Amino acid sequence: MVYSYTEKKRIRKDFGKRPQVLDIPYLLSIQLDSFQKFIEQDPEGQYGLEAAFRSVFPIKSYSGNSELQYVSYRLGEPVFDVKECQIRGVTFSAPLRVKLRLVIYEREAPEGTVKDIKEQEVYMGEIPLMTDNGTFVINGTERVIVSQLHRSPGVFFDSDKGKTHSSGKVLYNARIIPYRGSWLDFEFDPKDNLFVRIDRRRKLPATIILRALGYSTEQILDLFFDKIVYEINGNKLQMDLVPERLRGETASFDIEANGKVYIEKGRRITARHIRQLEKDGIERIEVPVEYIAGKVLSKDYIDESTGELIGAANMELSLDLLAKLSQSGHKRIETLFTNDLDHGAYMSETVRVDPSNDRLSALVEIYRMMRPGEPPTREAAETLFENLFFSEDRYDLSAVGRMKFNRSLLRDEIEGSGILSKDDIIEVMKKLIDIRNGKGEVDDIDHLGNRRIRSVGEMAENQFRVGLVRVERAVKERLSLGDLDTLMPQDMINAKPISAAVKEFFGSSQLSQFMDQNNPLSEITHKRRISALGPGGLTRERAGFEVRDVHPTHYGRVCPIETPEGPNIGLINSLSVYAQTNEYGFLETPYRRVRDNVVTDEIHYLSAIEEGNFVIAQANTNLDEEGRFIDELVTCRNKGESSLFSRDQVEYMDVSTQQVVSVGASLIPFLEHDDANRALMGANMQRQAVPTLRADKPLVGTGMERAVAVDSGVTAVAKRGGTVQYVDASRIVIRVNDDEMYPGEAGIDIYNLTKYTRSNQNTCISQMPCVSLGEPVERGDVLADGPSTDLGELALGQNMRVAFMPWNGYNFEDSILVSERVVQEDRFTTIHIQELACVSRDTKLGPEEITADIPNVGEAALSKLDESGIVYIGAEVTGGDILVGKVTPKGETQLTPEEKLLRAIFGEKASDVKDSSLRVPNGVSGTIIDVQVFTRDGVEKDKRALEIEEMQLKQAKKDLTEELQILEAGLFARIHAVLVSGGVEADKLDKLPRERWLELGLTDEDKQNQLEQLAEQYDELKHEFEKKLEAKRRKITQGDDLAPGVLKIVKVYLAVKRQIQPGDKMAGRHGNKGVISKINPIEDMPYDENGTPVDIVLNPLGVPSRMNIGQILETHLGMAAKGIGEKINAMLKQHEEVTKLREFIQRAYDLGDDVRQKVDLSTFSDEEVMRLAENLKKGMPIATPVFDGAKEKEIKELLQMGGIPTSGQITLYDGRTGEKFERQVTVGYMYMLKLNHLVDDKMHARSTGSYSLVTQQPLGGKAQFGGQRFGEMEVWALEAYGAAYTLQEMLTVKSDDVNGRTKMYKNIVDGNHQMEPGMPESFNVLLKEIRSLGINIELEEE
């Protein structure tokens, strides 16, 4: 493998054995591709905005005299970029402008004669844009639209599995689900009649639908039944015989023909009898006349002479009726063929219960069911029925729905109309009847072939269409009002309903979620999440076990591990690593094609439906050099089952061992040794890890860390290769390689880094460069690390030296004992940034004012404010400190005569205002790192706002000037090269000022042209610079668009540094979580023979019952990795020769059986080997991919190489006594995470505070500064102890005895420690409630 200069800095040793056939795809493509499809112009008009416009336009007036046509649309440029939107709290969006054409036709002239055409571009609201990382910025916060897994449109056949009816009879049903429109259900009842429901309303006999479609009884029977023809010969009756129809019946008479008895009376007819009849070619037999009684006529029989109806279709034959038919000259009688086995008489029975007998009565019946209480007219009934399933405006199966519909009915074509046809309805009924008859299977609803993914683009398109349809109605009415000659398209369209629909979707839809931004992994996982909830999906309460369960079709598509614990389990899933959606929205996963027993590198993506037909081998099947299967029998999957197949039968093979799991689960090393429940917790807890101060790459990883860090977008990644020309904490400049430059550009890429920004979860986002000046970089290299990344690898926690042993009960019940060294070295110190906002509004009594002049506040409290009343940057503040001084005018109060006198003497008018300053919340302390002031247009800016503005302008100018200088330098370097090659002497050139170089003339025409081109570029650069500077200045100085009634907003950013402390929650990656019980002095921790103390002591009893053995293997492998690091460190300290170092490191990389990774250090320069060694001295990072990881033997070899006992256990000594522990202890390195459940956020204590209004009891909860509830069970405890006074105190003065608690406060102030309980307020509430029932209760005073 070829490594770039940056990748050579630290190479992770990979224990994977299987070759990597397919690279990990871009992990955010599901979001980005979907949205791209939505906004890009689609000439076919199948997707996105184009499809929405085409489905609604043209809008014709009711009279047909005019129409509004759609021509095209374009998206403008967003006003603010993403960062500005986040700071200002606005939506990152672009204006949508649509070109519309108003066509007016001549009234009296022939159809289609155009009178006037007007074309105009119309503004149709703002469309939120997706950022490069797959998120949306809505009102300044980053949000993610989660993809939805919903039931695909189409037809589904299902049964109630015998749960509906008490008899346990299985009732079958069919449901036609459109993409939009009414649902159509067919279902059997326990009496085997077929019923229909529209939109889940009351059921009607299914034949009503057929009658409404215009079918008569005769035609209905003709559609669903085979016929038996009887001929009357004198007094004999002959029947046409189809032998196959007799199977399973019992002969009720001798079946004979040509004098030979084939089946005797009372015998069961078997397949042998049928073969005999077929062989002899028997087509007719004579039957006794009684046999026909009870059979059903298939058509109407009329007496030709009188025209009288003798026998109607679907009428049961009796001997009398037979005689009548015979007399009226009907010699051939057709009856329906039915039997109890596989040709039920369901439709015939249904016709009997059908109240309607012609089309009109059927339509009326449907109208009554859909619109109860409205009087039906013929037109209304016809229109309603027509609109239900046969109107393109109201009903759409969609391409997916039609494809699934046709596939289900085994039709050949997969395309067709979006509305239903007669044939569609009849074929669904036929198939349902076949299933009831025992032919065919019901569908599996949880099969991923029946559930599809709806991503951002599609959902946004649907919302947009909803908005357009609202506008359509208004436009139709506008077109019909006349005076069109003066109107333009602009006057027709009101953009409000459209932008409201879009805004509602992005702002408050159940699937538009506040992005989980704890760390890069949680961002990526959130964007790859798939939810079965949401509009048009399931609800938590109704979802049963089947929907939540893992289904065989999830393999390689949806992760079986990563799902939340709790009520949403199984409803919210994560996309597997390699999964993607196909054009219809079904999930597909890649497989390698197997041809002639050889596994090729040809990759096919198969959906769940296609996969069912193939035999697929697992990724860890043994292959030889050529890719042939070594074993005769191979474990494969086929039709959802796993079993052994011969190697000749295999058609596909998995692409990778990681294919099954999601990104989160693929980051757990030795996942294959963990119990699934613990793996689930492990995958979920990685998402809650807080980024530490210094990220530390995991010693034991899985090789997925780099992909996650790069794709998450938190790192700065090189767009093009080149050389690092400049680097500081906030900017990296790359001079691009000549071969990657675009013609006519300066060839400089500038990367501005994000510094100390707040994330959605209040963690800190900051980027740090990881390249140095002059280094070569290639496209895709990581230039700067973001939060939780280390040299371009995901680093969620820290590598800690752990020992599994009990320690004085401090690790009881999963508690964790931590060494003080961890705190001293700031290993788990995290930075949290809070945003506090102060809003100044215009009130009825006058505007609120932000000022440092606050009534009744001492000097000390104002010491951290400037003259505008806003806190300084860098001030250290604690709970209760004022951050922004604000006063609110309060109404004139009635003054007492004394106050009036005082006012008159001291002339004090200041108390007309009350203090409403922004203060630091209780229990929070930190440093102010930034202040932003937003002022409404037209409101005078205060001094601080102007200072901030000036600072921003300076910064912007500095940035742009530096950018210009960098670009100029690049350009002049090229001009210099052209002039020198054109014959100008270099030293003379250097004496001239650079600007004069452009005036020089060259004799060589080519060179002169190049020089002129470069001169043009230089002018363009300067012009561009002026333009950018002006735009920036305008943006910074313009007023802000604030909500109505808001004059000013001051946002203060507070950074809090949190060290690890008892009560914080920590976890490993295997679901092994615990709470810190004690931070122990270093000298008391157990230490080894070299005197190295351990960092963390874990409870060994947490392992066996939980069956997450992965943590033990990780510990051993971590120890080995550290051992090798220490050996390298020792060699570096002794200044060993590079050859020795190279040889040792090479040996380490080569260790293992048949590993796929080949690192050849002989191609590395000495300097590169030294730098690699520097980066490996703290431990050699190791990758052990999921299901393809390091074997026990390899771990032992690595331990041996690191000079550690192969048991992985060492002797420890007690730090307090220095005595040896009795047995050896497992010690190693485990990757530990600090989770975002910090004790600082949970700790809470109340002295006095607010009370509830009605009950007068203290409020509850930390947010309200509430008290602890002393509940029913706690009262029982005090009663059981007989602690009467304590109980009285709890129920009165400490709770809701208002007078008692005020008296008690007075007593305490007076130093008199006594209490007199009074009447609890809740008792008064009870009295009032009883009185409200009309029962008077009076308390007797003693």
Swiss-Prot record:
The chain's disulfide connectivity reads none
* Cellular component aspect of the GO annotation: DNA-directed RNA polymerase complex
GO MF annotations, alphabetized: DNA binding; DNA-directed RNA polymerase activity; ribonucleoside binding
Tell me which Gene Ontology terms the entry assigns under biological process: DNA-templated transcription
Write out the entry's keywords from A to Z. DNA-directed RNA polymerase, Nucleotidyltransferase, Transcription, Transferase
> Which EC class, in a word?
transferase
The Swiss-Prot or TrEMBL record describes its family as follows: Belongs to the RNA polymerase beta chain family.
The record, for PANTHER family, names: DNA-DIRECTED RNA POLYMERASE I SUBUNIT 2 (PTHR20856)
What protein name applies here? Answer: DNA-directed RNA polymerase subunit beta
Q: Which organism is it from?
A: Pectobacterium carotovorum subsp. carotovorum (strain PC1)
Q: What is the lineage of its organism?
A: Bacteria, Pseudomonadati, Pseudomonadota, Gammaproteobacteria, Enterobacterales
